[in-house]
């Protein structure tokens, strides 16, 4: 992990209920909105839409504190702009 990646991911804690290797195995070496746990891939328009949908489910958001959810949503919004994807505030 580069120092830039560490800085970007320092706002999210490692979750005990997740195996980060699973996300990397499933999606490959892609950008994640939660790079600590390799959750919410945001490398394609389809993944951006799915990430936005999932983080806005209360049960998924409840696994993070409010600051972490804001960080994840911010990363998804940036990826949406990059991939020209329109998302609506939930």
Regions found by a protein language model. Give the residues of each.
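A charge-rich, low-complexity, intrinsically flexible signal that marks solvent-exposed coils, linkers
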Residues: 1-90
